[in-house]
């Protein structure tokens, strides 16, 4: 069974000046099975970022479906989309995108705080990861000399 299905996905942008329409995605369909790895490749301007923004529920398509684990994410209401992203999606950015004014530990537990996990559970779960980073846990990311990428 596919964990991700994209059916006839379409995205059209309308330019601000002149109202011209630009088709970024046109009837794109594919599926991803559990355990598969997928690479998205293409020329600049070919729609890669548009596709990823739609798959991440950061943008809405003009048409089509995006079904993740059996749920069409296009139909998720605006007030529920943040919780859906937090509970079902993971992002791996090219850059770290961590909060400079937080310690590394604070950055790690932030998703748990946003999910309403109680303090004791947060500590327990974060320690599983933090033990590997013990020597830099309380450093601030703004101090670039002390925290190596």
Task: Tell what function each PLM region has.
Residues 19-22, 73-90:
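ABC ATPase NBD coupling module
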Residues 41-43:
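The feature captures the beta-strand-to-loop junction immediately N-terminal to the Walker
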Residues 56:
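Helix-to-loop junction immediately C-terminal to a conserved catalytic motif
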Residues 64-72:
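Conserved ABC transporter NBD signature motif
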């Amino acid at each position: 069974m596919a964990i991700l299905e994209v059916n006839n996905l379409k995205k059209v942008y309308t330019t601000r000046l002149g109202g011209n329409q630009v088709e970024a995605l046109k009837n794109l369909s594919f599926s991803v099975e559990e355990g598969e790895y997928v690479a998205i490749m293409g020329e600049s301007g070919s729609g890669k970022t548009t596709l990823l923004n739609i798959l991440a529920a950061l943008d809405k398509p003009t048409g089509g479906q995006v079904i993740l684990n059996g749920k069409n994410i296009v139909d998720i209401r605006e007030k529920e989309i943040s919780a859906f992203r937090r509970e079902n999606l993971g992002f791996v950015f090219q850059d770290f995108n961590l909060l400079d004014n937080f310690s590394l530990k604070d950055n790690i537990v932030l998703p748990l705080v946003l999910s309403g996990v109680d303090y004791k559970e947060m500590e327990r779960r974060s320690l599983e990861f933090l033990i590997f980073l013990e020597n830099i846990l309380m450093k601030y990311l703004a101090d670039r000399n002390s925290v190596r990428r």
